[in-house]
Design a protein with these regions (language model features):
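Ligand-binding cleft/hinge of the Venus flytrap
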Residues: 16, 34-48, 82
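C-terminal effector-binding regulatory domain of bacterial HTH transcription factors
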Residues: 15, 76-85, 95-133
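Residues embedded in well-ordered beta-strands
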Residues: 3, 23, 103-105
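Hydrophobic hinge/microswitch elements
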Residues: 45-90, 97
Length: 133
């Protein structure tokens, strides 16, 4: 966020991350993601980071970033409005994390209703456009 950049500056390289803070996300108590993840030559790479705060919800993750408590890595689609309004600023653009999957949940593949399959085929291009634009 601009608040973070004003306080700590803008990270310009992976090496500079040692001088910055990331909001750590933990799905399970005591098991936080304490790294910045990126893809290089088709492989996932990680740089260990320090944090001012660790959270366990996506709402708190984004809120902590907006308040200037650290850098986050999140899908563009979830931050689009904040980025367009200038509430958040993209940094280290060339270091993209592995793409997250989007899944359909349905009761049984063996007896998948035709209307469910048709809906999945219809919605797929819209979801792709939203996520990757």
């Amino acid at each position: 966020s601009p608040k973070y950049i004003e306080r700590f500056g803008t990270p310009r390289s992976l090496k500079s991350l040692k001088d910055h803070f990331q909001v750590h996300y933990c799905q399970q108590l005591g098991r936080e993601n304490d790294y910045f993840e990126y893809m290089e030559e088709g492989k996932i790479k990680k740089v260990r980071t320090k944090a001012l705060v660790s959270v366990n919800s996506t709402e708190a993750y984004t809120a902590a970033c907006l308040e200037g408590l650290g850098i986050i890595q999140a899908p563009y689609s979830g931050l689009r409005d904040s980025l367009e309004k200038g509430d958040l600023v993209e940094v280290l653009k060339k270091y993209k994390a592995e793409a997250m999957g989007v899944y359909f949940l349905y009761s049984n593949r063996k007896f998948l209703a035709r209307r469910v399959r048709v809906f999945m085929e219809w919605v797929e291009p819209y979801v792709k456009d939203y996520i990757y634009s």
